């Protein structure tokens, strides 16, 4: 996760994170990416059921009842363990988390245990009554997925009217005083809608958006050919940077982030070296605090059936199940080769990759997204094919 607005628009300084000792339990949510202890933010895909059928869904969700989901009591036991382990945030996701009737109860329980509770939703089922309940239980944030304006989004979601329904859900949350934001997965079919999405942020006073680079997992594994080319990715990031700057210059300081491609960090830094060298030095310090991709370290995932994964895109590999062992025990068990490798990946990347092994940004990006390397090359430790930096930019010939 790269905080575009924080870094490019200068809304965060290194001292902001240092003031809290970079302790994940003390840091405000907008500074968690700079924590030193990297206690995992945990995505709990609490259900596989969903009222939509998105073409890029990593969970391959459907609108049917699935067996073997963690019960309410099992969910509370998971939350107990996460809270005692020091996980600062639990992100309720799916499928569609609002289809579970016990979502408010579980979110309230997480808050009681001192965790921040957030949800990732398609927004279409959030009526005013549900928004009131979510506000009452102290939900910190509602992230609504929109992958384009109206027709583009509805095509992705597999339902006519999904865009308008999602906006209604977002408005209901706003009216109840819940912080909201958008989630947008970039690909060839919707990249042209990025300017309109920025317009929507301003028109609807939406304070946050995360732009996700495409990850080849679940139904998204069938969309490899729909991913942007490397040059198109650079152009998309340039556009996001430009529109973010313009928003801030107009007095609307929206929080803009990019997710799942950590070469965005060095790319932004190199851009600032030309535009504002003094700020570039501060940004490099912040990127060093961020430490790059955190799958298996600062981000984890628990499936609806209790399986533990390195993140929500690693569903094909489980480290264990919370029905058999606590998450905290599974997460710290280095007898699993992949878990141990993800926590100390640089030697493995240097042994197996070409570009990454020679890259001067490896300490900043941490090898980018391993699951994408595996999907394309069949090797977890190979180069991430979505890295758009040139050989000159990574210092390939200097190594």
UniProtKB/Swiss-Prot annotation:
Its cofactor is [4Fe-4S] cluster. It is an enzyme of class 4 (lyase). Pathway: Porphyrin-containing compound metabolism; protoheme biosynthesis. One of its GO terms (biological process) is heme biosynthetic process. Pfam families: Fer4_12, Radical_SAM, SPASM. Its EC number is 4.1.3.-. PROSITE patterns: RADICAL_SAM (PS51918). It catalyses: 12,18-didecarboxysiroheme + 2 AH2 + 2 S-adenosyl-L-methionine = Fe-coproporphyrin III + 2 5'-deoxyadenosine + 2 L-methionine + 2 acetate + 2 A + 2 H(+). Keywords: 4Fe-4S, Heme biosynthesis, Iron, Iron-sulfur, Lyase, Metal-binding, S-adenosyl-L-methionine. [4Fe-4S] cluster binds at residues 50, 54, 57. GO terms for molecular function: 4 iron, 4 sulfur cluster binding; lyase activity; metal ion binding. Residues 36-253 form the Radical SAM core domain. Belongs to the radical SAM superfamily. Involved in siroheme-dependent heme b biosynthesis. Catalyzes the conversion of didecarboxysiroheme into Fe-coproporphyrin III by oxidative loss of two acetic acid side chains. This is Fe-coproporphyrin III synthase. The lineage of its organism: Archaea, Methanobacteriati, Methanobacteriota, Stenosarchaea group, Methanomicrobia.
């Amino acid at each position: 996760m790269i905080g575009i607005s924080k870094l490019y628009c200068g809304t965060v300084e290194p001292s902001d994170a240092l003031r809290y000792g970079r302790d994940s339990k003390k840091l405000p949510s907008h500074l968690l990416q700079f924590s030193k202890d990297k206690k995992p933010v945990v995505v709990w895909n609490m259900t596989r059921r969903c009222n939509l059928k998105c073409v890029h869904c990593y969970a391959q969700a459907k609108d049917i009842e699935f067996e073997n989901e963690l019960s309410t009591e099992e969910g509370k036991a998971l939350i107990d363990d996460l809270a005692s382990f020091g996980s600062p945030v639990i992100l309720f996701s799916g499928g569609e988390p609002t289809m579970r009737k016990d979502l408010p109860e579980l979110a309230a329980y997480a808050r009681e245990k001192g965790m921040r509770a957030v949800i990732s939703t398609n927004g279409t089922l959030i009526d005013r009554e549900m928004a009131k309940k979510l506000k009452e239980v102290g939900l910190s944030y509602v992230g609504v997925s929109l992958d384009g304006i109206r027709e583009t989004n509805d095509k992705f979601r597999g339902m006519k009217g999904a865009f308008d329904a999602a906006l209604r859900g977002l408005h209901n949350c706003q009216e109840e005083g819940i912080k909201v934001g958008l989630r947008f997965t970039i690909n060839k079919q919707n990249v042209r809608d990025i300017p309109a999405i920025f317009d929507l942020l301003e028109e609807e006073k939406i304070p946050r958006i995360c732009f996700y680079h495409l990850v080849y997992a679940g139904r998204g594994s069938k969309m490899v050919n729909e991913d942007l080319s490397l040059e198109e990715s650079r152009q998309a990031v340039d556009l996001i940077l430009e529109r973010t700057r313009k928003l801030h210059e107009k007095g609307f300081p929206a929080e803009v982030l990019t997710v799942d491609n950590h070469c965005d960090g060095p790319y932004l830094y190199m851009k600032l070296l030309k535009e504002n060298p003094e700020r570039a030095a501060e940004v490099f310090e912040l990127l060093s605090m961020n430490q790059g991709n955190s799958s298996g370290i600062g981000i984890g995932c628990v499936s609806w059936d209790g399986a533990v994964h390195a993140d929500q895109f690693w569903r094909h590999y489980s480290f264990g199940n919370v029905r058999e062992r606590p998450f905290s025990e599974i997460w710290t068990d280095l007898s699993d080769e992949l878990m141990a490798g993800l926590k100390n990946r640089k030697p493995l990347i240097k042994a197996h990759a070409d570009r990454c092994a020679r890259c001067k940004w490896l300490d900043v990006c941490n090898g980018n997204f391993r699951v994408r390397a595996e999907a394309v090359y069949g090797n977890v430790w190979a180069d991430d094919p979505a890295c758009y930096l040139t050989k000159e930019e990574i210092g390939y010939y200097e190594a």
